[in-house]
């Protein structure tokens, strides 16, 4: 295969570099290799520029329309009273929270921009900035935002999925989660998100919010117990933080085959008994096959990066509950934006 490469010419004691011509045949391979197991053919790589232009031009418009569509269909179950000052419509508040995250606005800027969108979203009264800040920190909106997230994922079709589980953090700090040293994360005021990601669709299926000092593995069962009923997990992907027997057993209970990271000193077991021994034996006996199946675990980190790029990793609220509710808005809006780019969402 390497016969097509031009050698380096040696003149006396000097090495003279020549042009190395690597043909495309070098990149055509199949079977199990160290890099990956996908066949790579650079001559067939193509980009649909027309579709890319359509998505780039209409992404914001489709996102705003998706907010209007889903908030109209969602049942708020808001209680009303004939006494006292009339309460703001909760649909208007939810629209405000979603638009604020989508456009990266402050509460005051959100109040101003909603005045332009009053007729588009059918809002009678625009909430002021102090109301938005106070409502987002309330326990009532914790329930509403969790129900709204569930409303979005419940609308997806029934399917089997490969689920990757990972954790990230959000705070008001300028330095992001990935830029923060691991030892500092547990002592700082981060909102830690433990999420289950559908790796093929880049959609957040379920999540759990904790303080930053909670270990990833402790929330694995809670996250998987919250998976929507229309998703049947067939494989569980996670890093070595989730190699414990409780995590593996939780994935098995939901019908998924766990393929998590293992310890560096793990060995092959001739007669494996526990879930971890079975998984470690698979890693040691078929390392290339395990690595190929495990490769999509990185999609969970890709989703976290997409959320940070689209909505930012910094939080505006100062109260503990308000910060968590702000993260709930980010996760629900990210799913909404992802689904709005698909034709099936509008059918």
Give, region by region, the residue ranges found by the protein language model.
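Charged, often Cys/His-bearing segments associated with DNA-binding zinc-finger transcription factors
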Residues: 1-81, 150, 341-347
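Polybasic low-complexity intrinsically disordered regions
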Residues: 7, 81-94, 99-102, 134-254, ...
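Helix-centered, glycine/charged polyanion-binding patches within enzymatic domains
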Residues: 35, 240-309
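Helix-boundary capping/turn motifs
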Residues: 69, 86-91, 106-109
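Short, charged amphipathic recognition helices of the HTH superfamily
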Residues: 104-116
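Short, basic interhelical loop/turn and adjoining N-cap
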Residues: 116-131
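A generic secondary-structure signal for well-formed alpha-helical elements
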Residues: 121, 140-143, 311
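Basic, amphipathic alpha-helical segments enriched in Lys/Arg and hydrophobic/aromatic residues
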Residues: 286-347
């Amino acid at each position: 295969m390497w016969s097509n490469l031009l050698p380096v010419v040696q003149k006396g004691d000097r090495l003279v570099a020549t042009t190395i011509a690597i043909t495309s045949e070098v990149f055509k391979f199949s079977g199990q290799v160290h890099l990956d197991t996908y066949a790579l053919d650079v001559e067939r790589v193509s980009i649909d520029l027309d579709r890319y232009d359509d998505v780039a031009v209409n992404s914001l418009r489709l996102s705003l329309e998706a907010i209007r569509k889903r908030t109209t269909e969602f049942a708020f179950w808001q209680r009303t009273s004939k006494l006292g000052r009339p309460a703001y419509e909760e649909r208007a508040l939810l629209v405000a929270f979603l638009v604020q995250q989508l456009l990266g606005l402050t509460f005051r800027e959100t109040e101003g921009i909603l005045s332009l969108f009053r007729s588009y979203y059918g809002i009678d009264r625009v909430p002021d900035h102090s109301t938005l800040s106070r409502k987002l920190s309330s326990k009532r909106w914790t329930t509403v935002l969790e129900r709204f997230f569930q409303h979005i994922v419940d609308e997806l079709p029934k399917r089997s999925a490969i689920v990757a589980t990972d954790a990230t953090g959000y705070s008001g700090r300028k330095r992001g989660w990935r830029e923060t040293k691991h030892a500092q994360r547990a002592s700082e005021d981060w909102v830690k998100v433990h999420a289950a990601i559908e790796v093929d669709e880049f959609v957040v299926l379920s999540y759990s919010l904790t303080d930053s000092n909670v270990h990833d593995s402790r929330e694995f069962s809670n996250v998987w117990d919250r998976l929507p009923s229309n998703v049947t997990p067939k494989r569980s992907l996670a890093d070595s933080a989730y190699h414990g027997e409780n995590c593996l057993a939780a994935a098995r209970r939901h019908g998924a085959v766990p393929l998590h990271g293992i310890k560096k000193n793990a060995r092959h077991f001739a007669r494996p008994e526990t879930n971890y021994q079975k998984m470690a034996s698979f890693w040691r006996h078929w390392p290339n096959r395990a690595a190929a199946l495990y490769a999509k675990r990185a999609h969970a980190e890709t989703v976290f990066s997409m959320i940070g790029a689209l909505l930012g990793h910094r939080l505006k609220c100062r109260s503990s509950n308000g910060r968590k509710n702000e993260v709930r808005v980010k996760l629900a809006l990210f799913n909404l934006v992802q689904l709005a780019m698909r034709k099936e969402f509008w059918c």
